[in-house]
């Protein structure tokens, strides 16, 4: 697409503001515990990934740099900021490295996968895998869609997952060469899906129909005037796409604006179905088509041959500004369902007396039904009291140990911390413009929350710098880290896992017994885990004369256990008998799972049982 000029403009605005040293004002702020210069260029849109690469119980920081000022590098830092290793790359990184064990069979040792070329003027695109010691394992180059003589660049971060459930990890990414790709664990091409325009969005992976295979959910650009390979005639805007494991289109929703945002997927309302959330971008907005920007919430209708992305009740929600931010999902108010959080804005900054109403960036949070969370939207202010655009995607965790979640994002030179009520809390101050998402964790396993972000330094702006901030003693709460890094996890799945959920069907049993014909009747129950993970289940109580086999077991994701229920009919005269309830419980980690206990009423009818047989006619196809 004619897609790069707006990015140049936005970057120039951001760095022009950075050209003057900040004048300190009065707000409370947190200084870095350490900062580290990297041997590569500035860090712009590469969000750090945290992972224990070497198994020492401490987290390493994995991040990439641009080519602005120095050669680009992929760097791994220890918890104290020591550079563990760095490798020089031929092309810049504006994506977030993914970390996963992609070996087949799995060996428990993680690898690092990074996409390159996401730069307006230096867009030689590749996806490269390294082992945990920085040795290159493979490299895959995209195609030259723009005719520059080099592969088109990749802004999209790689997403890693086992799409077909066979134990072999796949890598999915979008490219500026107008394709969505899937590679196998060896970096070998598996398929591509042509979208006829650039892809900036990072793919989410989720099993939308609970069949054991992962679907790919991703946003794209589109320019109208042509015909897609399947005959569809698009208009100017973008798409939200769902692809299956083989690269076949399951659903496509035409949008009136490009989609730079990376989708977030989760069961936000607790109904057992997954929802999809994504924001609209600003390419066409900057061309003078000032259509209303939105954040969308979708439910997937899988009943037809082609799935349909349907608007959720209360969605889409209008926002003041378009942008590049991707939504995060978290239970901000501890009510058991998930809220949707996103930043907005694309360029500029303003003084306090101009904002509101003349702001450039806002942070939004909604309940699952589209109603705003109390205190949102809010217009954050940085260290200098300025409001600015928010290109960063929010991350969410309890960073101060108070039992409540905070929202973190970068704006101007700072990482800002906002409470669940929309009140701005801490300001984590650096010395240069920040665009990426902060990562949250306990780097050195000392019980304190660490926040990591990449950027540069006003006095050394040709180099990349990594900053780490540390909160107080006992501030790290591992149970309250719902969205701690870009696209939630080191694989960048963008998926909020569902808790294990006990499901037993049918919900009641009605057994028919022909009087005088035997001593027992049999029926069946199907027990499933309709959530993620696993749980132990057991038949805790049954009526007299009733047996259930098996009586206990472990329910894994999408597994089904067939339970045989046998009712003794000895001693019953004709009539209908309510025998009582079979009680089945499920527990994980010592706590009941959702749907537990399941109570199944058992009813026995004894008398004359009549059977009717219906004819069926079969005709073979010729």
Where are the regions a protein language model picked out?
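Surface-exposed binding patches on compact interaction domains or structured appendages
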Residues: 500-510, 528-566
């Amino acid at each position: 697409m004619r897609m790069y000029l707006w990015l140049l403009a936005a970057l120039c605005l951001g760095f022009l503001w950075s050209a003057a040293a900040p004048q300190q004002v009065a707000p409370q702020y947190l200084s870095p515990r350490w900062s580290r210069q990297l041997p590569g260029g500035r860090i712009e849109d590469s969000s750090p990934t945290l992972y224990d690469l070497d198994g020492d119980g401490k987290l390493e920081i994995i991040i990439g740099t641009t080519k602005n000022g120095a050669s680009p590098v992929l760097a791994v830092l220890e918890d104290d900021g020591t550079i563990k290793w760095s490798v020089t790359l031929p092309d810049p990184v504006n994506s977030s490295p993914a970390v996963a064990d992609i070996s087949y069979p799995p060996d428990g040792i993680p690898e690092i996968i990074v996409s390159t070329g996401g730069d307006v003027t230096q867009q030689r695109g590749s996806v490269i895998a390294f082992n945990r010691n920085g040795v290159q394992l493979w490299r895959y180059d995209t195609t030259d869609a723009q005719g520059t003589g080099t592969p088109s660049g990749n802004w999209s971060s790689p997403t890693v997952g086992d799409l077909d459930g066979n134990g072999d990890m796949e890598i999915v990414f979008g490219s500026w060469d107008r394709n969505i790709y899937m590679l196998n664990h060896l970096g070998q091409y598996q398929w591509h899906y042509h979208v006829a325009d650039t892809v900036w969005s990072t793919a989410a992976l989720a099993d939308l129909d609970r069949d054991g295979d992962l679907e790919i959910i991703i946003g794209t650009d589109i320019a109208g005037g042509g015909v897609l390979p399947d005959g569809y005639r698009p208009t100017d805007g973008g798409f939200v796409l769902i692809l299956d494991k083989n690269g076949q289109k399951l659903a496509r929703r035409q949008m009136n604006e490009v989609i730079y945002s990376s989708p977030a997927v989760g069961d936000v309302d607790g109904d057992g179905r997954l929802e999809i959330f994504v924001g609209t971008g600003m390419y066409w907005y900057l061309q003078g088509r000032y259509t209303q920007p939105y954040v969308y919430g979708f439910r997937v209708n899988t009943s037809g041959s082609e799935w349909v992305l349907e608007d959720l009740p209360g969605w889409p929600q209008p926002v003041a500004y378009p942008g590049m931010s991707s939504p995060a999902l978290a239970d901000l108010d501890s009510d058991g369902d998930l809220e949707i959080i996103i930043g907005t804005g694309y360029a500029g900054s303003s003084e306090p007396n101009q904002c509101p109403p003349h702001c450039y960036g806002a942070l939004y949070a909604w309940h699952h039904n589209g109603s705003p969370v109390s205190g949102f939207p809010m217009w954050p202010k940085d260290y200098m009291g300025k409001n600015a655009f928010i290109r960063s995607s929010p991350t969410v965790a309890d960073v101060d140990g108070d039992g409540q979640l905070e929202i973190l994002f970068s704006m101007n030179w700072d990482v800002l911390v906002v409470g669940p009520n929309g009140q701005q809390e801490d300001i984590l101050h650096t010395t240069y413009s920040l665009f990426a998402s902060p990562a949250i964790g306990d780097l050195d396993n000392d019980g304190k929350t660490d926040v990591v972000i990449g950027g540069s330094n006003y006095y050394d702006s040709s180099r990349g710098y990594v900053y780490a901030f540390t909160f107080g003693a006992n501030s790290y709460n591992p149970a309250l880290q719902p969205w701690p890094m870009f696209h939630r996890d080191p694989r960048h799945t963008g998926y909020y896992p569902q808790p294990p959920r006990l499901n037993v069907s049918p919900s009641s049993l009605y057994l028919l017994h022909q009087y005088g014909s035997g001593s027992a009747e049999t029926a069946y129950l199907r027990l499933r885990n309709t959530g993620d993970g696993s749980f132990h289940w057991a038949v805790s109580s049954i009526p007299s004369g009733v047996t259930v086999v098996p009586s206990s077991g472990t329910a894994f994701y999408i597994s089904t256990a067939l339970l045989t229920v046998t009712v003794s009919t000895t001693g019953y005269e004709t009539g209908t008998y309510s025998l009582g309830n079979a009680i089945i419980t499920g527990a994980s980690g010592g706590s009941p799972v959702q749907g537990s206990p399941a109570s199944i009423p058992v009813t026995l009818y004894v008398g004359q049982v009549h059977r009717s047989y219906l004819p069926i006619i079969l005709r073979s196809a010729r």
